[in-house]
Amino acid sequence: MELVNIFLETDAGRVKFAIKNTDDVCASELINKFVELLSEYIHIDQSEFYLVVKDKDIFYFKCDRGSISIVNNEFYVFDEPLLFVKDFTNVTGVEFIVTETMPCRIIPKNNHAVISVVTNHKFYNGLSL
């Protein structure tokens, strides 16, 4: 399971948030783990953002000051070809890919940068546009 709209920015490049999904762990526990990992870089209790999780399908969750809820699928595909690295030394910030219907308000910790990138790629009748 991985986040497809939130990444770490590091001294070496962009890093994915991914957690190996095991059958004995429910999805809500994994979402909480993603939020826990993000809490090292942003103030969760003061921030509002969306988590788009991809396993076999894409699921949307909203984190509003620490309260997490599932939201309707907006059919955004988050399919831009992005480059990622595995090895890094220093985290410099967090990157959020947002859409016109997924606003965010992020309060960073410890001088971390917050980067926002907008996408409008949606899934229409079997096509990614």
Curated annotation (Swiss-Prot):
GO terms for cellular component: virion component. InterPro entries: Virion_core (IPR009201). Induction: Expressed in the intermediate phase of the viral replicative cycle. Its main location: virion. Pfam families: Chordopox_E11. Keywords: Virion. Changing residue 66 to R: In strain: Mutant ts49. It comes from the Viruses. The keyword Transcription regulation does not apply. It is found in: Virion. Belongs to the orthopoxvirus OPG073 family. This is Core protein OPG073.
